[in-house]
Amino acid sequence: MSDKKKNAEEFEETFSDKTSEDESTVENETVEENENEDVQAISEVDDLKAQLDEMEDKYLRASAELSNMNNRFRNERQTLQRYRSQDLGKKLLPAIDNLERAVAIEVEGEQNESLKKGVEMTLESLRSAMQEEGIEEISAQGETFDPTLHQAVQTVPATEDHPAETVVEVLQKGYKIYDRVLRASMVVVAQ
């Protein structure tokens, strides 16, 4: 029996060694598979993070672009509203010039005085309406010549009363709406 017992023990040792080898091989394969799965999962997570970052960047850019567009539209709307009377003002300037010429004429008689008074009231009403819209006269008489505001149509020699580059006489009034010139003043400039 001792031989049988010995053989049985040897068989058990051999079987146990083989089983241990098989188990360790299986464990190694399982560990390698788990490591591969972990690497793949980490790679997928990194890819998803990169995609998320890209999408967040696109979202932020689109949001900033939308905000810029809204600001630009608001500014354009304000500019349009501010200068809405520009064309009408340009069209009214000849009428104002004519009314000013009519008021400058000397009249005789009560009826003519009454008519002149009506023209003055009409002129004042137009000036007031234009002023409410931001249209105002450009001051020129005695001012330094500014080519952005004045149009020199004639020059005269400079004197002590009228130094060089100053406006001596205004031939036609100029007007501006806020910071835009509707019509430059036609002036005589000392040289």
Curated annotation (Swiss-Prot):
Instruction: Report any Pfam family annotated for this entry.
Output: GrpE
Q: Where is the composition biased (Acidic residues)?
A: 22-38
Give start-end positions of Basic and acidic residues composition bias: 1-21
Picking any one GO molecular function of the record gives: protein-folding chaperone binding
N-terminal signal peptide: none
Instruction: For the region Disordered, give the residue spans.
Output: 1-39
Cellular component, GO, one term = cytoplasm
User: Where, subcellularly, is it found?
Assistant: Cytoplasm
Per the UniProt entry, what are the Gene Ontology biological process annotations, in alphabetical order?
protein folding
Task: Name the NCBIfam families for this protein.
Answer: PRK14140.1, PRK14156.1, PRK14162.1
PANTHER family in UniProt: GRPE PROTEIN (PTHR21237), GRPE PROTEIN HOMOLOG, MITOCHONDRIAL (PTHR21237:SF23)
Q: What family does the entry list?
A: Belongs to the GrpE family.
Q: What is this protein called?
A: Protein GrpE
